């Protein structure tokens, strides 16, 4: 049973991760019936024609038209990414509610099983089957790090190393809401002190690997895919130095989030394109300097 549950819940983790990747691909491949790549190609071709005769109003208008179309499609993709983050967030809330509902049901089953089997005359097999099914479902949502039955027939469960179910009750998982974007973070209510603004997180999202067996559970995968915020090109830079993130910091940061990384990459494309075009058409630095030093120059 343990081996089956381990593989089953690992599948839940990667299935949820795969869905986010597929969503990104879908938005890039088709926006209003046209691939986003086509909008980039059309803009490139428009500039090719413009370069042949910049004074031609037809070429000028074509650039304006294709640039406007590119920006509108880019905005649609970006909005699609952010909307999907909200969808993931709603799913996380649903999953947290389901985990708590399972905990409540298991408390009831524990008590009923204990009452029936107290005399050591009969086994509450039907109730045990129900409890096993709930354990399977729970294992698909979160990483059950330990579960065992005591001599009284009561099942004890730990989630992510913290006690979830004991002989008396279950410990509820709360959802801390970010006021900026309304993204939720699961936390242990019994280990937190809200009055002191201290919330004990259920999941450690910085140390996930197949080697340690921490790549388990749908909620964790959804949290990673969603990330903790919306992103733009600035998220590839270090807040202190202003330079590009080191590969190590990148891997520990937004690289773990499918949606945040995709948003930052898309915005980087738009940013560099806009800056380079403006630096060519209305530069405040020599054009040769832009190309020679591969700079991102401010513009007016």
Name each region found by the language model.
Residues 1-300:
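Structural signature of extracellular appendage/secretion-system components
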């Amino acid at each position: 049973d343990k081996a089956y549950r381990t593989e089953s819940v690992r599948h839940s983790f990667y299935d949820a991760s795969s869905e986010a990747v597929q969503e990104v691909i879908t938005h890039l491949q088709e926006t209003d019936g046209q691939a986003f790549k086509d909008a980039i190609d059309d803009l490139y071709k428009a500039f090719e024609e413009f370069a042949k005769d910049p004074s031609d109003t037809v070429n000028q208008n074509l650039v304006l038209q294709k640039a406007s179309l590119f920006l509108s499609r880019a905005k649609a993709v970006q909005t699609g990414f952010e909307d999907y983050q909200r969808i993931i967030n709603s799913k996380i809330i649903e999953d947290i509610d389901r985990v708590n509902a399972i905990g409540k049901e298991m408390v009831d089953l524990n008590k009923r099983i204990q009452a029936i089997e107290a005399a050591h005359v009969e086994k509450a097999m039907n109730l045990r089957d129900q409890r096993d099914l709930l354990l399977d479902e729970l294992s698909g949502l979160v990483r059950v790090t330990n579960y065992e039955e005591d001599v009284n027939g009561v099942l004890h469960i730990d989630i992510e190393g913290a006690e979830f179910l004991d002989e008396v009750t279950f410990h509820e998982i709360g959802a801390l809401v970010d006021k900026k974007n309304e993204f939720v973070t699961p936390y242990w209510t019994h280990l937190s002190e809200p009055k002191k603004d201290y919330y004990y997180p259920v999941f450690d999202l910085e140390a996930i690997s197949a080697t340690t067996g921490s790549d388990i559970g749908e909620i964790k995968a959804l949290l990673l895919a969603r990330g903790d915020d919306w992103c733009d090109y600035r998220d590839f830079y270090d807040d202190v130095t202003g330079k590009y993130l080191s590969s190590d910091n990148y891997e520990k940061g937004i690289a773990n989030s499918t949606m945040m990384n995709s948003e930052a990459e898309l915005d980087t494309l738009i940013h560099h394109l806009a800056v380079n075009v403006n630096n060519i058409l209305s530069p405040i630095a020599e054009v040769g300097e832009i190309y020679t030093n591969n700079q991102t120059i401010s513009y007016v």
